[in-house]
Amino acid sequence: MKKSKIIEALIRQAEADKSKALMALDLLENQAVGIGDHTANDFFKDANEALDLLTDADDKLETLNKYWGDQPLPF
């Protein structure tokens, strides 16, 4: 059964959040020289925020797949 538009939108949002978090972590890890005004505390704060976003996105994708993977909608 095809997923509803709301479930598809939730999946797309979680995928976008995951990509954004991975990009931020990659920039902080590999291209930090280009980010001028950051202190060590700023880098850690930004990395922690990106990790939180990544964890949240992965959790959402796992939950959406668990309940709306290849199965019919539960309601």
Regions found by a protein language model. Give the residues of each.
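Extended, charge-rich alpha-helical interface modules
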Residues: 2-75
